Curated annotation (Swiss-Prot):
Name under which the protein is recorded: NudC domain-containing protein 2
Biological process per Gene Ontology, one example term: protein folding
Main subcellular location: nucleus
Gene from which the chain derives: Nudcd2
Keyword match Acetylation: yes
Keyword Kinase on entry: no
Role noted for this protein: May regulate the LIS1/dynein pathway by stabilizing LIS1 with Hsp90 chaperone.
Residues modified to Phosphotyrosine: 145
Sequence ranges assigned to domain CS in this UniProt record: 14-104
PANTHER family reported in the protein's UniProt record: NUCLEAR MOVEMENT PROTEIN NUDC, NUDC DOMAIN-CONTAINING PROTEIN 2
Residue list for modification Phosphoserine: 142
Organism: Rattus norvegicus (Rat)
Length: 157
């Protein structure tokens, strides 16, 4: 089986004071830099459908209402190399038209250029899912790609 689309084509990260976040059609990834040597028991992470909270050593790093809903039971977090916490959230709405413009409702918004690149990437990922025999990992997209690109579902085959 081939590597996931984001591994072949890269991601479009949105930088934050604590790390970065990025998204695919189905998931939102949050990468938080923590002090080297951090242990799992130092981490308090709460994941709900519309809320996320992360504290390390009692210090709140991230807390708020998510931009859109996620499937709470599928959210996970891991401590990697004792210096980064990765949170993976599964989107409830999994299509290219559901490109999050920010991580939280009022914080960590992608600037217009990053938002544009995120939308392009999600549209390409949508095309890859619809056409599994083609490799879109090195493709560029232009034209009508906002809101997931054109809808070809009602065209005759």
């Amino acid at each position: 089986m081939s590597a996931p689309f984001e591994e072949r084509s890269g991601v479009v990260p949105c930088a934050t004071p604590w790390g970065q976040w990025y998204q695919t059609l189905e998931e939102v990834f949050i990468e938080v830099q923590v002090p080297p040597g951090t242990r799992a028991q130092d981490i308090q992470c709460g994941l709900q459908s519309r809320h996320v909270a992360l504290a390390v050593g009692g210090r709140e790093i991230l807390k708020g209402k998510l931009f859109d809903s996620t499937i709470a039971d599928e959210g996970t977090w891991t401590l990697e190399d004792r210096k980064m916490v990765r949170i993976v959230l599964t989107k409830t709405k999994r299509d290219a038209a559901n490109c999050w413009t920010s991580l939280l409702e009022s914080e960590y918004a992608a600037d217009p250029w990053v938002q544009d690149q995120m939308q392009r990437k999600l549209t390409l990922e949508r095309f890859q899912k619809e056409n599994p025999g083609f490799d879109f990992s090195g493709a560029e997209i232009s034209g009508n790609y906002t809101k997931g690109g054109p809808d070809f579902s009602n065209l005759e085959k």
